[in-house]
Amino acid sequence: MFGLRLAQASAALALAASAGSALAVGLGPLEKSGITSSERKGLYLTVSNPYRTAHNFRVFVEEDSGIAPGRVTIHPSTATIASGAHRRILVIVDGLFPGEEVNFRLCAERIEERRVTVHARVCSKLGARRLRPAR
């Protein structure tokens, strides 16, 4: 009887531990685009911390996502966010030519201080388009 309860308690603890590590940073909206008449376009996104304690997060352009990372500026690209809190970030796309449209993926993840089993991240699909001059 005691052994059965101990096994149930161990299983519950293992499930709770695995569920806690499977949480992922929040990033929204998951898709956003905008139009500009200048060579720069800014977009606001929100990073959320679903964990029970404050953590450090980073936001970055996904490799091979269709834009050179040097054309994108992220303010801030790293931040400490309190438990259950949100932080707005500004993403600026630079060097847009008239008529050019760029699409890329921007990702957010928790900065891990140790090796973890599940490395969770979330990505948004972003787009920016520059208008052609009127004739």
Place the predicted regions along the sequence by residue:
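Short acidic, flexible loop segments centered on an aromatic residue
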Residues: P50-A68, A108-R110
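Terminal connector regions
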Residues: G95-R135
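Beta-sheet-dominated interaction scaffolds and their linkers
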Residues: L23-V47, T78
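Intrinsically disordered, low-complexity Pro/Gly/Ser/Thr-rich segments with frequent PxxP/GP/PP motifs
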Residues: P69-G99
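Bacterial N-terminal signal peptides that target proteins for export
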Residues: M1-S10
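Short, solvent-exposed loop/turn segments enriched in Ser/Thr/Gly
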Residues: S37-Y44, R87, G99-R105
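Cleavable N-terminal signal peptides
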Residues: A9-A12, A22-L23
